[in-house]
């Protein structure tokens, strides 16, 4: 079985603690929950891969449209930990397909002044322009529900096919800490929808 590796064309981390801060060109992606001054804080990250690159791999190596044969395949999301601190006995990381477009921006964590020219916890793109939708989503789409933390993206939680469109990995402090998620259902649905299959 051949292995094809692709890298994201854009990514960014969203922070509740810094609701308008953009981190689009920061080298680190962060997923965490923590307390700051007795307030719960969250960070999550967005990753986008080239649809053209995904479709090319699918069309060239997985699916044959002439014979309607689809080869056995799987898609995995791999992220490698730079630093891990404060792990609970068990920690769970979940991945969902994002619903809607977003702008990566050019910010880095800790820029002073704060960079706001891309997505953040509150905004999908340049700060002050378009907020993440908080209601009236499309079918199978949701977002954060906490009133104090409005924002943080919108994502798919299901599909008309009934396939599970999320992935998760549970870590404990003795496990390897690199992320390795099976995102086959997410990718197959994404490809089929992008091609109107």
Enumerate the language-model features and the residues they cover.
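Secreted, disulfide-rich extracellular signaling modules
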Residues: 1-197
